[in-house]
Amino acid sequence: MRTVAVYATVMGADGRFVPDLQRDAFMVLDNGRRQELTLFANDIQPITVVMLLDRSGSMKANFSLVQQAAERFVDVMLPADRARIGSFSNRIQVDPRDFTSDHEELHRILQTELQEEGPTPLWNAINVGITALLHQQGRRVILIFTDGMDAPFPGQSNNSLKDVMKRAEEEDVMVYAIGLNPSDPYAGGGGYRRGGGGGGGGGFGRGGFGGRGGFGRGFGGGGGRPPVSDHPDEGLPKIAAATGGGYFELTTTKDLAATFARVAEELHRQYALGFTPEKLDGKMHALDVRAAGAGLTVRARRSYLARSAG
């Protein structure tokens, strides 16, 4: 029998992680039908991640800052975590050939292997990241950083947001995105402007179950650099919400390193839930994950592909 794994991030009303919930605090609905949880874990689960960094022309002034922020993510990876580093502009490259836990190797790639400036083939890059993760076990994550909108390769077949969102949902790949938008008129001095949002969940029974919520707000800021792009692509919070990841939009480069570290912390604080589906009909099923408790919000993937046996 197949177990459908669902990883959930639970936040309190104060925006902090809620780490100590028990199995009976969660409810998972498959196409609206409540499922019995056959898997529950609230200990740290290892991750396999493809980190994709925008090397487009608009990012040139910030290349070194992004590199340092990505190195911060590597520094807080745990021994069982594995990663590959990708960059996208004139081409999309991902190194090394195999996933590794070797921090020194990942630092070397960040310091010497990233390409020079070019366009921003955003959805193509995510598609390459999904392909890299296909045969990996456990929790599969893409972390992408960009300051701009998708700018596909001219004269070539390119992926759309719809293409990669569908594929990420079918292949159970969680997408986290960090967008840099220093030109935001609502910035008010820096820090996060907003995170992506999700639909609200209703109550259930005594005490209520909090449903999907928005993405965390965060770090204070100030300063920043002149605008380098109109704004990050509006598809980023959509694919993050659909896959159970997170979207963080920054208004200053000051918060880059802290945000990369924040993503790593969140990934290490997720709950692992699982259930055995009633039928494997080869169709996409809607998922809804809720947690009991006042003011709690849950982020988890919103669908899964009920692949038939064989």
Which residues make up each language-model segment?
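Scaffold/interface architecture of coatomer-like assemblies
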Residues: M1-G310
